[in-house]
């Protein structure tokens, strides 16, 4: 195994191939690893930065680029803080042998983690100041009189010394300075520029190498054989049923896990199809048509996020009380390419090439599955098909490692489309109920919110391989979902899942951390057992909650014939959220939308509004959606999105714009067409006919984006802000166009027509 020192010494050659091949892209992650930390001490500068004899710089990060563009943005960050050119920086991402442990790439945390005063940016700033100090000694000058630029330090009299001459290929042997000076925005020469994606040339020319392209000498091919239905248990495997297949290497059976290994992909596919397994039947699945009612009847683990204690009394005194119930289906990641990993498990060392968003947690879980210490496992991130959440990336890595251990040779495993779509961790199904009381002037005087969330599993973390299907089949249990009653809230509200509407004061734990003014408030959540595996899908629970919160806010405004924007501003106190609300309304030339919808022939037009303080303080967005609804077919067609986003200082406007626009389109797909289906035994949406998403020939609406950048604020996440507000804005636009309120996503043509018919019947009654 190559040592980190050898790796960094040869980085000038190695990273070029990493960049062009795509083997080094960043992840979004939550925090540090604590007791699971890597051998790279995050408090030491040498864990992050190395300057080479040729003047190039290697920077190591535990945040990987999954397609969201942070490879480019964080290369800019290092170049800016170190005062070197963009071309001089070689960024290494997510390799447990060489990069620090920054947890998982998730939650829109990559930029907050590495951009703000910590981790990568602070390390680069520390390195710059250390080099200035070395140059001061070299020149016999005071460091404050020196300037750094283009990989060199210049003295007032014009003398110049290159970084390579000061330290080239040697270690800094310094701690990361928590007080190192960060370069201010008015000093930026690389950050803040619309630099095209550094991986784009390889992507558009077809030379980018995804994990599916990884090849290892002596590699075999694997396939897994999953149970035929949910909850089935393995009884027996007839290995004789595949003995006639040429090139078959081994059948691996462990607990309920079954896999085959062969010399060729074709032979592995044949063996997986032909292998005879006997399974016990699983329990019947709840009927899909009554699933949400079923969900609300299950035992639950309850939590009170806020509870002022007076909601019932305030509702009883209100001039008017409105109620609504919203539902959100299971949805899947729907990655275009199925998950793939390559594992090489030897007696003393295991290496896994994986598309995981969590290299160190994945290393820990693989070590558990292989019954060996984590230090003997190396996980190297290689980008897979687009995900932003938890598709089969972790599970396929576990499977590949177990198969490789079983045969003693490298194994490449790629899931079938059915493996992927039947067994991935779906986005959670939810039921959300609102009750709100209005005063005589129409303002909200009390709001009660209750939701039910279907949960089973999640990210495996460092010690929960059973949170995905592979670990469960290998004998590990997912996180406990034992029912428990709610206790009075004692923690301060952070609103990480946007469960609490933006208009609540959010008082808990001795502080009011909400964005709004409603002080008679209660939010009760029920976590119930899901029949399917669940986990993070871009904007996990945030999109579900914001859909319900923002559509209900629109209902309240409509009930008193108030302008939706004015009504929101009436109840908002957070200045950054108010800022994007006003910016979006101004850009869209918003006028009073009460009764604004118009109809011409079979088409009705309307516009809707929605806003969010993502996770309470991790990005702010407000969206105006203009739509056309065909009243004969029920088809909803967005024609324009106008969005305002505040994510603080912007590393790369081009990359941010890509994230915002991509989020709007994915949000449109999830709002209009995406839904997992099942029968009594299994998931039935296991191909692109059964699971619909926006097609490549979809007519993309016009998009106008406004960036709001307040002074003196920290960088926040951006990758999940726009998707979060899209379904609510579309639902509100449909109502504005037709008078029909859709409370169940997705807004399929059948549901739109049913809502139109119900509205017509109500008006005729």
Regions found by a protein language model. Give the residues of each.
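Cofactor-binding beta-sheet edge motifs in enzyme active sites
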Residues: 2-20, 28-765
